Amino acid sequence: MTPYSSFLFFILLGILLLPTIILGLNGKRFQAYNMFISIIILALIFSHDLHGVIALCLFTIWQVLLISGYLAYRQKANSGFVFCGAVIASILPLFLSKIWPFLSHPQPHHPPHNLISFLGISYLTFKGVQLIMEARDGLLKEQLPLHRLLYFILFFPTISSGPIDRYRRFVKDEQKAWTKEEYADLLYTGIHKIFIGFLYKFIIGYAINTYFIMNLPAITHNKILGNLLYMYGYSMYLFFDFAGYTMFAVGVSYIMGIKSPENFNKPFISKNIKDFWNRWHMSLSFWFRDYVFMRFVFWMTKKKWIKNRMAVSNIGYFLLFMLMGVWHGLAPQYIIYGLYHAVLMTCYNFFEKWNKKYKWLPSNRWTTILAIVITFHFVCFGFYIFSGKPFHHHH
């Protein structure tokens, strides 16, 4: 059962969350109950997928051993090699799940069963890597209580597609004793978000896909216009589908007393590509910014291998977006999508510097509108690449 994809899922979820809501509105602690229903809901999600359950359990044991082991090691020593080893070991299951389809030679009609992969592996990997990095930075000092670590890794509302939370932020919410009034606020916000999610995913997103994208052959026979309309349609569909999905995840988290981070902030009114990545899939881009880009820039500055700061940040962007592309998958569209955004970020970097120097583009209402329109088209073209449509040859 895929999370948030059927009304049955919401009905079961509603029934299971009732005790949480009653406890919360009476100002009582509900985290132990939440941990209990998390197990039930994970069992529901994976009910038809025994491979998935086994993979999830093995993956979780692997990550917990790695994190606990590295934390224990970090209290005594701090070698860069051990740190890199731990990070690589943490990413290994995800890496294997990505290359698995290429390793096993499938018959064209029977895709091989990916034994390593399971729903949510890409998002859970972020949690493991993040904990190891925070231990390295000395932000996590003592061993993490097992139940709390497991609850963080396996927190079901965000398991399949994020948003990506941070351990210390999560635990602060998890340990907090919400008052009746605070919980009533959380509950209201959560339900509100869930209804916006219904609007986005099941009404707007569904309508765009069913009545626009599916009907494109009937709307126009012109190939160029057809592709252009597909680009706009797909970009809108992607946003409403994914933002709706995120609304569900965040809404359910709020009802469970966890304020999961937001993922979208009006991405289509971004004034430039940097602004776009601060508004689109924010928990993902901030994760890459903090754990890949900043580390890389810091490391380069410390080692003084490349003196030019502009070059360092541009190489950092290529590293970040190539990783982000590969993280989505190894199909050509994802890798080209990553490259495309790296090039855009680099060009914008140069433009920004140049514009600061020569004041070529004045800042007023019209240039802002122009900037939004230009950014929007660059972004949509990126999604057009991402959709894989340019790579499908029609017979």
Curated annotation (Swiss-Prot):
Transmembrane segments: 7-26, 31-46, 51-76, 80-104, 121-137, 180-223, 225-256, 309-328, 334-351, 365-387
Membrane topology: Multi-pass membrane protein
GO BP: lipoteichoic acid biosynthetic process
Record topology, Cytoplasmic segments: 27-30, 77-79, 138-145, 176-179, 257-266, 304-308, 352-364
Functional pathway: Cell wall biogenesis; lipoteichoic acid biosynthesis
Enzyme class: transferase
InterPro entries associated with the record: Ac/AlaTfrase_AlgI/DltB (IPR024194), DltB (IPR024024), MB_O-acyltransferase (IPR051085), MBOAT_fam (IPR004299)
Residue ranges, Extracellular side: 1-6, 47-50, 105-120, 224, 329-333, 388-395
Superkingdom of the source species: Bacteria
A Pfam family annotated for this UniProt entry: MBOAT
Subcellular location: Cell membrane
Catalytic residue positions: H328
Keywords: Acyltransferase, Cell membrane, Membrane, Transferase, Transmembrane, Transmembrane helix
Cellular component GO terms held in the UniProt record: plasma membrane
Intramembrane segments: 146-175, 267-303
Primary localisation category: membrane
Keyword Zinc: no
PANTHER family reported in the protein's UniProt record: ACYLTRANSFERASE, TEICHOIC ACID D-ALANYLTRANSFERASE
Free-text comment on this protein's domains from its UniProt entry: Consists of a ring of transmembrane domains, which shield a highly conserved extracellular structural funnel extending into the middle of the lipid bilayer. The conserved catalytic His residue is located at the bottom of this funnel and is connected to the intracellular DltC through a narrow tunnel.
Reported function: O-acyltransferase that catalyzes D-alanylation of both teichoic acid and lipoteichoic acid (LTA). D-alanylation of LTA plays an important role in modulating the properties of the cell wall in Gram-positive bacteria, influencing the net charge of the cell wall. Catalyzes D-alanylation from DltC carrier protein.
Name of protein: Teichoic acid D-alanyltransferase
